A protein has these predicted regions:
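Active site of divalent-metal-dependent phosphoester/diester hydrolases
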Residues: 4, 113-148, 244-320
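Structured beta-strand-rich core segments of catalytic domains in phosphoester-bond hydrolases
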Residues: 4-11, 15-43, 91-197
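Eukaryote-specific, low-hydrophobicity, charge-rich regions
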Residues: 30-61, 74-84, 113
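Residues that flank catalytic or metal-binding motifs in active/ligand-binding sites
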Residues: 55, 102, 143-145, 185-189, ...
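Active-site beta-strand/loop signature of hydrolases that rely on acidic residues for catalysis
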Residues: 58-63, 73-99, 115-119, 149, ...
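Short, flexible loop segments at the rims of nucleotide/cofactor-binding pockets, characterized by
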Residues: 61-66, 92-93, 177-181, 212-215
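Short catalytic/ligand-binding loop motif for oxyanion handling, primarily in non-cytosolic enzymes
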Residues: 70, 93-96, 123-126, 157, ...
């Protein structure tokens, strides 16, 4: 059972030093993960406005690229009246986002409850374009992860880790990015939410970018199995950045991913996802290599009645993220 806390324990300076000095391999990574309580817990907070959702639910999934501007990001999706928001790449105690708890700030602005989980403990300030936003030369907590915002209080939540070998840490064994040293790995958060038609399970996830289709297939298989154990025979909505097409040269085509058929074979449907590519140039990623379709909804036991791709460019022409948001409305049959 995942522990749910009011705040996540920080990493001590002694442990931080040992993490930075440790061998860069999977064995060391797994041992260090076991010493960081926040890696196996979730943080909850905020204030839910409703007791139960209706049988028609408005959902946004958005990779907010660190969430440089939490209040503006919340304001940008407010016209959609979301009852569930599935976030990826949210910072908590990072210098590049003013040491803020960006999930908490968004939840407050939207008057929603939240659950936040750590994907990575960041060991540095980030890449060159991110360092331009740093307000300090240190990270207060160094947390970076996923979140679920909800207009209702979750009945149950769980953290689902999708790997433990240290894909961004174990540079002795895998091609880790030297500009982004990290402890942790890809993960998902699942929450059971009450609705007038009965409980549903919503899932915020983020699959691996620095890997091929087989790696993401294995992660998605692990995710679906974990959902079956957590919320058997329940309507499910999964949303997030699945990094489809990454490391699939020469065309980087999302249609070559095998996870789509994997999900269909288990009763899931992808039609809640709007058409179109979901990436764009941003303040942190001003010159992306290509445009890609990375962000998806995957549902079981519910029906999509509307969907839309929502530009991340705000009313002042500023991109809030290198991903556009995806929005859908689902009906519970």
């Amino acid at each position: 059972m995942t522990r749910v806390l009011d705040s996540l324990p920080s990493v001590s300076s002694d442990l931080q030093a040992r993490i930075k000095a440790a061998p860069r391999n999977a064995v060391a990574h797994r041992a260090l993960m076991a010493e960081v309580p926040a890696m196996s817990a979730l943080q909850s907070g905020g204030q839910a406005a409703l007791d139960a959702l209706t049988d028609s639910v408005s959902v946004v999934a958005w990779n907010v690229e660190r969430c440089l501007f939490p209040e503006d990001t919340a304001s940008h999706i407010q016209p959609l009246a979301p009852q569930v928001v599935l976030l990826s790449e949210v910072d908590h105690g990072m210098a590049r986002t003013g040491q803020r708890h960006t999930t908490e700030a968004m939840a407050k602005a939207l008057e929603m409850a939240y659950v936040f989980g750590v994907e990575f403990h960041e060991l540095d300030l980030g890449g060159p374009t991110e360092q331009a936003f740093c307000t300090d030369d240190f990270n207060l907590f160094g947390w970076h992860g996923n979140a679920i915002l909800s207009a209702v209080p979750p009945e149950r939540v769980t953290l689902i880790r999708l790997d433990d070998h240290g894909h961004w840490f174990s540079s002795d064994e895998v091609p880790a990015d030297p500009d982004q040293p990290r402890l942790g790995g890809r993960m998902a958060i699942a929450a059971v939410l009450p609705t007038e038609a009965g409980p549903i399970c919503v899932v915020s996830t983020h699959l691996e970018s620095n890997a091929d289709a087989d790696h993401r297939h294995a992660q998605f298989d692990r995710l679906l199995r974990a959902i079956d154990a957590f919320a058997p025979d329940m309507p499910v909505l999964i949303g997030g950045d699945l990094n489809t097409g990454n490391h699939l040269p020469p065309d980087f085509d999302w249609q070559r991913e095998t996870l789509f058929e994997l999900a269909r074979a288990r009763g899931y449907d992808w039609s809640a996802t709007p058409d179109g590519v979901t990436t764009r140039p941003s303040l942190i990623t001003p010159h992306p290599d290509r445009q890609m379709k990375l962000d998806w909804f995957c549902t079981r036991g519910m029906r999509s009645t509307e969907n839309r791709l929502v530009s991340s460019v705000d009313e002042n022409g500023r991109p809030l993220s290198d991903h556009d948001a995806v929005w859908c409305r689902v009906a519970l049959d």
